[in-house]
């Protein structure tokens, strides 16, 4: 909803074009990404911002930037997430996120206005997905949705790319990296990365030092 609000009330009124198409090819040249090819058109730009999530289509899949895994110290790499109803909204609607340790990981509980966002984080090295789902449902009790299709299984790539701005590609958020803590760092990292990118783009010319500094700062 936050992203939808930003699009409708901030980006579009300022002239940002929202194009919904699937990228089918990403040719490269000496500057990095040459263009983004869809089924109907090829889009050319001076700078490409990779915001493709864990897929990291531009930085990782296209430019092959090395990825430094942190799974040796942060083993959690999977999660089940679901939208759960309130049992007693008046008493359950809290202004904070609650985290609870259970058998093989921890559960986040984020009270929203009309529902609760909740999920179970674990490592698939120690427990399989189906067993983890059963543990999660047991923890939720009567709040647990009955249909498995209501649950989303997420595979997390824990670590960060060696460089976050390579040639004409700058990675933002999960496409840059992810560190699984006791609270998702997604929104914070997106905000900070964009702020740093804007500061660099205000310069008369972006140098390799600026690109390296973007990686160091972020």
Please tell me what each predicted stretch does.
Residues 2-137, 194:
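Predominantly flavin-linked oxidoreductase catalytic cores and closely associated redox partners
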Residues 8-17, 42-44, 141-146, 199-208:
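Secondary-structure boundary elements
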Residues 24-25, 154-159:
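Short, solvent-exposed loop/turn elements at beta->coil junctions and helix N-caps
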Residues 82-87, 157-161, 215-218:
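Short, conserved secondary-structure transition motifs
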Residues 101-155, 175-188, 203, 207:
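Conserved FAD/dinucleotide-binding core of flavoprotein oxidoreductases
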Residues 133-136, 161-166:
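Single, function-defining residue in the core of a domain
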Residues 169-171:
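Residue-level marker for buried hydrophobic side chains located in beta-strands
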Residues 183, 196-218:
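Active-site-proximal substrate-binding core of FAD-dependent oxidoreductases
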């Amino acid at each position: 909803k936050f992203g939808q609000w930003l699009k409708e009330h901030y980006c579009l009124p300022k002239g940002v074009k929202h194009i919904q198409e699937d990228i089918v090819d990403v040719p490269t040249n000496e500057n990095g990404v040459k263009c983004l090819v869809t089924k109907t058109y090829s889009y050319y730009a001076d700078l490409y911002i990779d915001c493709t999530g864990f897929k990291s289509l531009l930085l990782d899949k296209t430019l092959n930037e090395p990825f430094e895994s942190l799974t040796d110290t942060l083993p959690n790499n999977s999660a089940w997430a679901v939208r759960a109803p309130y049992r007693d909204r008046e008493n359950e609607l809290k202004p904070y996120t609650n985290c609870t340790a259970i058998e093989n990981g921890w559960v986040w509980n984020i009270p929203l206005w009309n529902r609760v966002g909740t999920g179970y984080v674990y490592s698939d090295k120690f427990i399989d997905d189906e067993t983890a789902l059963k543990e999660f449902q047991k923890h939720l009790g009567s709040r647990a949705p009955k249909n498995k299709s209501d649950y989303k299984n997420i595979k997390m790539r824990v670590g960060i790319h060696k460089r976050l701005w390579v040639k004409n590609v700058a990675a933002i958020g999960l496409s840059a990296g992810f560190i699984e803590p006791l609270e998702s760092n997604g929104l914070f990292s997106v905000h900070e990365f964009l702020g740093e990118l804007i500061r660099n783009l205000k310069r008369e010319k972006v140098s390799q030092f600026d690109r390296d500094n973007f990686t160091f700062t972020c």
